[in-house]
Amino acid sequence: MVEVSLTVGKLDASLALLLTKDHHLIEFPTILLPNGVRAGSIIKIRCDQDFDSEKEEAEKFTKIQDEILQTFATNLPQPPNLKIKNVTQTSCVLEWDKLNLGTATLKNLILFKDGKKLGSIPQPLNNRTSKLSGLPIDKSFKVQLRLDTTAGTFLSNEIEVTTHKMTDLSGITVCLGDLTPNDQFNKEDIEEALKNMGAKYPVQQQVKVDTTHFLCTRENKQNPEYVKANDMNIPIIRPEWLKACERERRIVGVRDFYVKDCVLPDIFAKNYWQKTTSQTAGNFSAQSLPKESPAVPDKEGLPKTDLNKESVKDEPTEVDHAKEDSVTQEPAIEEISAVVSENIITPDIANEETDIVEGESTKIESVPTDEIDTKVESTPVAVETEDVVAESPADQDAAVTLEPTSVDDQELHQSDETLKQVNDGQQEIDVGDATEQPEKEEIDDIREQVNSTVNNTERQETATDDAFDTVPLEGDENIATAAKETEPTSTEPTESVNVTNVNNSASEEAGKDDNDDEDDEDEDADNEGKSNKTSEQSSEGSATGSPSKKKNKKKKKNNKKK
């Protein structure tokens, strides 16, 4: 303990100045001075150390410090535990445990994707899930949470998420709504379909964050789950969508299965829930396949037989066409051969026909050998006579006369071709019968007679042409009567042409160069038929007669040499 004697130097209301013996000045509060002290008074001050009170204070302090340490230093916030709740083709649902903040307070909870901030979780103390939508199909990415508190920041574990493929149906989570009692399915059928698909079952009764589809058959806005699904933008569809996915073995679009917009007849037509019929059909097909297996080759063989039949049917048609072509050519040859045989066997009949010709136009002796060509050429020559007769009234109808001439020319060419075939056959016969010299001599004599008759007929034709030309110019009755007399002679060119054809055919039998001569004579005959209107054309017709004589003479000489 220390005792000090001090002298009060000055006394104030708050402070007093005390002086020591060593003349040190000490300020001392006046409130601690005893009562009645004034300036010049001497006082004594004693100072002691209180060890007991010091211990008590120390114990109190340590106790308070321990409490602070245990309250704020030992209970720290825990980092969040992040988990995957559900994954689909385009979405992911994340889940984490309840946050343990300790004695700290929460500032923020942030979600990161591949190191990039996606956003803050709303109401982090209440929400423990988060859904990410609009993700790419079959892609991988990393997700992490960061917890910000007054005690510091804490990072969660990093999770790698891979979205599903279109064929992976394990992410489908269904919530079941209202079903009508008349439906073809029930809750057990839906759960069985989910099981076959590989989706999550049993079905949910309440809409949650991981609910992907809400199944019902009718709209019921009184149902809170229906309203919640509508608010959460969850597709509200019919249960047939599950069967469609089960059939396709892949996720199917929900557009055709919306409860609001679906077309029920189209859905019912597909018979998604007919299990008995499908099973019975499968069993029936499995039983019938081994029985019908031997019949398969027979069915496959049928088309082959049909093809063969068709090919067989096609072949006779080609053969028939060939036969028809050959048959059309053969009758002409058969008729000509019949005519030849008739001429050889019955010369009397031929003589009668030649007599008829002599009675109508000019007197021509009958020749049995040359009548072969006269009969064959009778039809085209008759056509030429029609041309001659038709050209007489050409002043009235010129257009009418032109049409049949084109048809007649075609018939003449066809008859000429048949005559050439017959003449070729006859030439071969004549070559084979070279020993028959007397017959050739008789033929030469007949040719001379025919040439003389041809000259007479040509003169008559020129006369008739002149008569027709002079009728419209002169009005005399004598000329009209002459024209009338010429009318019956209009038939004479028909027969005279026949004679020329006889002569030509006979000449064709004799030599090999007859084909060229026939062409020239046919052209001359056509020119003569068309020259009825003008005298100049008639003169050309007479000019064509003179070269025919020269040709006939040459042919005679050749025949005599042979």
Curated annotation (Swiss-Prot):
Query: Which SUPFAM superfamilies is this protein grouped with?
Result: BRCT domain
Spell out the Polar residues composition-biased ranges: 534-547
Question: What InterPro entries does this protein map onto?
Answer: BRCT_dom, BRCT_dom_sf, Chs5_N, CHS_Export/Cell_Fusion_Reg, Fn3_2, FN3_dom, Ig-like_fold
Q: Which GO terms describe its molecular function?
A: protein dimerization activity; small GTPase binding
Region (Disordered) residue ranges read 283-329, 370-562
What segments bear the compositional bias annotation Acidic residues? 514-526
GO (cellular component) term, any one: trans-Golgi network
GO BP: ascospore wall assembly; cellular bud site selection; chitin catabolic process; conjugation with cellular fusion; Golgi to plasma membrane transport; regulation of DNA-templated transcription
Q: What sequence ranges are listed for the domain BRCT?
A: 164-259
Keyword annotations of the record: Golgi apparatus
Q: Which PROSITE patterns match?
A: BRCT (PS50172), FN3 (PS50853)
Compositional bias annotation for Basic residues: 548-562
Q: Where in the cell is it found?
A: Golgi apparatus
Q: Which Pfam families match?
A: BRCT, CHS5_N, fn3_2
Give residue spans, biased composition: Low complexity: 488-508
The UniProt record lists the Fibronectin type-III domain at 78-170
From the record, what ranges are coiled-coil? none
**Is Calcium included in the keywords of this UniProt record?**
no
Give residue spans, biased composition: Basic and acidic residues: 297-326, 410-419
Functional description taken from the UniProt entry = Involved in chitin synthesis and also required for mating.
Similarity field: Belongs to the CHS5 family.
- Entry protein name: Chitin biosynthesis protein CHS5
The protein's organism comes out as: Candida albicans (strain SC5314 / ATCC MYA-2876)
What gene makes this protein? Answer: CHS5
